[in-house]
Amino acid sequence: NKSKKRRNRVSFLGAATVEPPKPIPLTWKTEKPVWVNQWPLPKQKLEALHLLANEQLEKGHIEPSFSPWNSPVFVIQKKSGKWRMLTDLRAVNAVIQPMGPLQPGLPSPAMIPKDWPLIIIDLKDCFFTIPLAEQDCEKFAFTIPAINNKEPATRFQWKVLPQGMLNSPTICQTFVGRALQPVREKFSDCYIIHYIDDILCAAETKDKLIDCYTFLQAEVANAGLAIASDKIQTSTPFHYLGMQIENRKIKPQKIEIRKDTLKALNDFQKLLGDINWIRPTLGIPTYAMSNLFSILRGDSDLNSKRMLTPEATKEIKLVEEKIQSAQINRIDPLAPLQLLIFATAHSPTGIIIQNTDLVEWSFLPHSTVKTFTLYLDQIATLIGQTRLRIIKLCGNDPDKIVVPLTKEQVRQAFINSGAWQIGLANFVGIIDNHYPKTKIFQFLKLTTWILPKITRREPLENALTVFTDGSSNGKAAYTGPKERVIKTPYQSAQRAELVAVITVLQDFDINIISDSAYVVQATRDVETALIKYSMDDQLNQLFNLLQQTVRKRNFPFYITHIRAHTNLPGPLTKANKQADLLVSSALIKAQELHALTHVNAAGLKNKFDVTWKLAKDIVQHCTQCQVLHLPTQEAGVNPRGLCPNALWQMDVTHVPSFGRLSYVHVTVDTYSHFIWATCHTGESTSHVKKHLLSCFAVMGVPEKIKTDNGPGYCSKAFQKFLSQWKISHTTGIPYNSQGQAIVERTNRTLKTQLVKQKEGGDSKECTTPQMQLNLALYTLNFLNIYRNQTTTSAEQHLTGKKNSPHEGKLIWWKDNKNKTWEIGKVITWGRGFACVSPGENQLPVWIPTRHLKFYNEPIRDAKKSTSAETETPQSSTVDSQDEQNGDVRRTDEVAIHQEGRAANLGTTKEADAVSYKISREHKGDTNPREYAACSLDDCINGGKSPYACRSSCS
């Protein structure tokens, strides 16, 4: 009956007769009960808890419970002396699926039309009037303990939204929003703001406002909600969401900032968060709070000590003054909004106005993402940010944007600035530079550093040109009319070069050329840039000094970048090299001195204090200083093994997507190109040994391994490991990866295959890094067949099967040392290279294919070829397909030859069968003499040669 009477009353008031909204169920991550034990409570608090629980039980907010869930409960005493019950729901919140916020920000009261009458109401105990879904009630159970456990504890569970539940605000907003929806539909010309349980209604006339409020009362009651009668506001000044609202003006509510509680980072973080929240109303520019923001720097521990500096104290006083005096205006709904951009110090300031009435302030963050942010880019970013804010406030773009730039500067910004193009994308309003005549903005501290005045984008005519350089040894230098070397405390080449640039930025026209792109970009941008604070004090000092130096100049300058260590001709490269020489490291100086004087290793070590290994490497890799070394290879030739497991190359590459296992150790057999790779957490000797043991299990044990000069490969532990397995070890040229070209190419091939599998593969079961590697290796070794091959790498590795049609053929090969052409036999042929047997008692020679010619092809006069370097035989006419991939295959004859050499047995009969050479007297003939065809069955030419056979065929 009561419900029927209530519905009749609501109908009489004119509201729609609808059922109250149904409870909104929660989504749970788990149905496993969460039980957190109740802690003991003092007797006084326990008595207060019993009273509060009985009160809630009478109101129907809780009910007795036998739930397997439990959350601790406690009470606090208010200033008025009353007690308040709270539930610790942190454990329960952890298993609730968040609903997400429905109102991510506070509504702006400035959008309330000016001079419209208002009514503001507050819903009474809003959470306690919204029911929980029946199935969710048991999850919010709590226990009231008994002293000394002398009786069973009393247990209850919430039937309404509990305070502190993760989704209570969202459910409350949804519930109240549904109740207000009929009001919004019927009174669409009224302006209604609803935030949690606070509701503001505005209408053009008082009569319409009363009608709207009457209907709203009925709808709220119909939804089971209650209005707090003591919190209804009907006259100015209104207080809503921390603001004092008058007929036309809006002011922040008067507050006092307590400074005695500011002792730790957390205290200052909260204070600045609150100040930032009301800054759009206060209008405090970013530069006026820089000292307060600086206090947040340093240790990120919330309890770390912080102190209020005198400068920051002044800024807090400014905030308090602004709170007392600042005000913004309610808008005219029929007039458009405009955006003014002021070029204030530190960063620009935006102001949203309507006519000359201030609506809201807009600021950029104090800290930036980039180290240098150009002032023009900051203006563009602020425009884009404030345009979005205006659209959010009223649903429209501003009618006009006023910027501190001329029309020509605006035109250039559209052409040259990507940030400007983004900030003003799709803007169809007016861009102007005429500010309204009003005194309310005159307090702003403006800057003149908007666009560059000193820095030029084009070289200066008739100006001095200076080259700068820096080194990690702390030396900086510049060259020009005079040279100078400057000692700096920095261990960074870029920082040392910054010192050189600052030094040469004297007050006269100058063109600066630097080989550091970092320094060039910093110097170009620093004039108008906001410099991001860095924890590195040295870097801060350098950048600030650079900016001050540039801004103090009276004459323009130009700076550009030049690539270092190139062999390009011209005076720029020469002059830059001269500057580089002034600061080059000990190793570079040692290499340059040896190239000039060919001093021995001991002399290099003594003069430059380099290690013995580095000194010996410099000498050993000098072609003029080699006295007794293994034969050097021709340019473009990377030695291969002549049979499986003869020579491996090994390296470490990085695959970032593997996470901790990003160090991928790669081994490739240079004969078969069989690849094996394993992923590890590092590249130390222990990781290398683990990788090699894996390789031995798959590929076998090699005779020789070639690596770079990494610490993991040069350690004593690794050498001992190799000696145990009877493996010889060589390294490439220090700091030069060309000696390991095969494995470097393999790294790229492997990474490409991994990318293909990741982006286009269907093998979702390959979840771990090693599984992904294994799939890639299986494809490369057992499935792929490369051009000019007939078998896979796995078949070649396991069987040693021949794979090139040119193996065993007679060829002419060019001896670059003697400038002569010799005859030989192909042992193996790959992409751009070949291994040739030059004759008896001689080791095989690796030669680029451009220095080869098949034996049955026409040849020019041997005498002329010997005497005139320009008259060489035609280059090999081998199809380019024969030079693919560089895979090598052995012949049985070469195997015999190698085995004999390895055993130091000298020349054997079998070795003679494959080691041959045209006699010396043939060299002088225009055409080699012809002899009868050889009749021996084992003739190396198959008995078909028109020339004489030597050695065992003679």
From Swiss-Prot:
Record note on domains: The LPQG and YXDD motifs are catalytically important and conserved among many retroviruses.
Organism: Homo sapiens
Gene this protein is translated from: ERVK-25
DNA-binding region: 809-857
Protein keywords: DNA integration, DNA recombination, DNA-binding, Endonuclease, ERV, Hydrolase, Metal-binding, Multifunctional enzyme, Nuclease, Nucleotidyltransferase, RNA-directed DNA polymerase, Transferase, Transposable element, Zinc, Zinc-finger
All copies of domain RNase H type-1, residue ranges: 460-588
Position of sequence motif LPQG: 161-164
Function recorded in the entry: Early post-infection, the reverse transcriptase converts the viral RNA genome into double-stranded viral DNA. The RNase H domain of the reverse transcriptase performs two functions. It degrades the RNA template and specifically removes the RNA primer from the RNA/DNA hybrid. Following nuclear import, the integrase catalyzes the insertion of the linear, double-stranded viral DNA into the host cell chromosome. Endogenous Pol proteins may have kept, lost or modified their original function during evolution.
Region Disordered: start-end pairs: 862-888
Domain Integrase catalytic: 640-801
Integrase-type zinc finger segments: 585-626
Note in the entry: This protein is synthesized as Gag-Pro and Gag-Pro-Pol polyprotein precursors. These polyproteins are thought, by similarity with type-B retroviruses, to be generated by -1 frameshifts occurring at the Gag-Pro and Pro-Pol genes boundaries.
Motif (YXDD): 195-198
Pfam families documented for this protein: IN_DBD_C, Integrase_Zn, RNase_H, rve, RVT_1, RVT_thumb
Name under which the protein is recorded: Endogenous retrovirus group K member 25 Pol protein
UniProt catalytic activity: DNA(n) + a 2'-deoxyribonucleoside 5'-triphosphate = DNA(n+1) + diphosphate; Endonucleolytic cleavage to 5'-phosphomonoester
Family: Belongs to the beta type-B retroviral polymerase family. HERV class-II K(HML-2) pol subfamily.
Enzyme Commission (EC) number: 2.7.7.49, 3.1.26.4
GO molecular function: DNA binding; RNA stem-loop binding; RNA-directed DNA polymerase activity; RNA-DNA hybrid ribonuclease activity; zinc ion binding
Domain Reverse transcriptase: 57-245
Biased composition (Polar residues): 867-879
Residue numbers binding Mg(2+) 2: 469, 580
